[in-house]
A protein has these predicted regions:
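Perimembrane loop-to-helix junctions flanking transmembrane segments
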Residues: 93-99
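Alpha-helical transmembrane segments of multipass membrane proteins
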Residues: 72-73, 100, 200, 204
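Helix-loop-helix hairpins and the membrane-proximal interhelical loops
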Residues: 2-7, 20, 31-92, 103-118
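Helix-loop-helix junctions within the multi-pass membrane cores of secondary transporters/permeases
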Residues: 115-207
């Protein structure tokens, strides 16, 4: 029986090695393509949720915009400029405490009194945040994103986000998908920007 020559064995090994390398490269290429497809799908879903959240605020705007305008005009009557009103509303996104702060502004209390009164009124956000936190943890929302979500959270943002959580639960979604950070931010950013902008307009008109 004729034994294979050393050259034939070497060629055979080389062919096998090339085939294995080609298969590995093909598998890597398929994995990369699949990863890109999943990433693109997640990106599209995030934007879809964001715009869904923004659209859900439209009925609420009927009540929020007039209140923001009234707050701005009251601020102007108490000596706040449009820029000052916008800054206050942007950094303290809570209508009740802002009306209280504007009312206290003219009575010339100390700055500490205004801060304490605002903080006490905003304490309800601690309860709202505590109710939302378990769903955010299940969705594995990072700490920076959680802080951002809490910053733009007001009563209406919380209510719409919880409504979305319950809707997804009824639809049979898993616990990790009940809270949508994108939906929450769509609601929060829309309400936040609308609020401080219309308050600034009210201050400019009423000044």
């Amino acid at each position: 029986m004729t034994k294979p020559t050393e050259g034939a064995l070497s060629a055979k090994d080389g062919t096998s090695s090339e085939r294995v390398q080609t298969d590995a490269e093909s598998a890597d290429s398929e994995a990369l393509s699949s990863s890109k497809a999943v990433s693109q799908s997640d990106h599209e879903d995030a934007w879809s949720d964001f715009w869904a959240g923004a659209r859900s605020t439209l009925p609420i705007m009927i009540g929020i915009l007039p209140l923001g305008f009234i707050l701005g005009t009251q601020g102007a009557q108490h000596g706040l400029s449009a820029i000052g009103m916008a800054i206050m509303c942007a950094f303290n996104f809570a209508g009740g405490s802002e009306f209280a702060a504007v009312a206290l502004w003219s009575s010339a209390p100390s700055f500490i009194v205004i801060v304490c009164a605002t903080w006490l009124i905003n304490c309800r956000h601690i309860v709202l945040g505590a109710a939302l936190t378990p769903f955010m943890q299940s969705a594995k929302v990072s700490t920076p994103r959680s802080l951002l979500a809490f910053f733009v959270m007001c009563d209406e943002t919380w209510a719409l986000s919880m409504q979305e959580v319950h809707r997804r639960r009824k639809a049979g979604r898993p616990a990790a998908e009940l809270f949508s950070f994108s939906y929450h931010m769509g609601v929060g950013i829309t309400l936040w920007t609308s609020w401080f902008m219309v308050a600034a307009i009210g201050a400019a008109v009423g000044g």
